[in-house]
Structure formats: structure tokens, C-alpha cells
Amino acid sequence: VYIIGRDDETNQGRKSLQQLTAGLDPSKPILVLDHQPHHLEQAELAGVDFQLSGHTHRGQVFPLNLLVDRMYERSHGYHRRGKTQYYVSSGIGIWGGKYRIGTQSEYVVIHLSGRAD
């Protein structure tokens, strides 16, 4: 199993998923931890099996959740593109104000199992 953690998008030295997965054995599972769920297609193109992201807080406050839903292909929850699976957690934390209105915080337990060949 490969577990890849990516630098934040604000880091100018952030490597592409293609760079991070180059040379890995594609027969082994590739898991990516990427704070922001931008450009989900990159994980699919890089042969990533599962990506876990957060960052969005699902908008945290209504009506910002409507805007966040438009900003991201998936602002929260499970998603699949081709063979790549994604989960974007709305998290338990907050940003700015100490409240959430119209969105749910969450913690996620993910069970991983072997591939069915």
C-alpha cells in the first residue's frame, strides 16, 4: 500500500500527482491525502485508488454551503470517477466564527480492504 500526503495548494513547491505516483507499482493500492478536493480528475489520471480530502467544511454556514457546492466537483461525501474513489469530509472543525448553520460536522471512519481480483 502506498500512502501519499500532498502539500497544500498554497505551497509553490507542491508536486503534481503524476510526479508523486511516478515509479510506483500500479498493482498496489495508492491512497492520497489531499487537504483540498480540487481537480479530482488528477487522481483518476494518476491511477490513485482512494483520495481523502477535507477543507470545505461543507460551507459551514448557510448560504455559503450553496456556493461551496458550486466551487467543488464534490464538496462533501463519497464520490467515484472511473476506478478512483474519493471521500471529502466536512470535518468537525470550524473556520472563523464558532458555529455551523445549515451544515453538519462529521468524523469519518473508513474501512479499507483488499482488492477483489
Predicted regions and their residues:
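Soluble catalytic domains of enzymes that build or remodel membrane lipids, polysaccharides, and related
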Residues: V1-D117
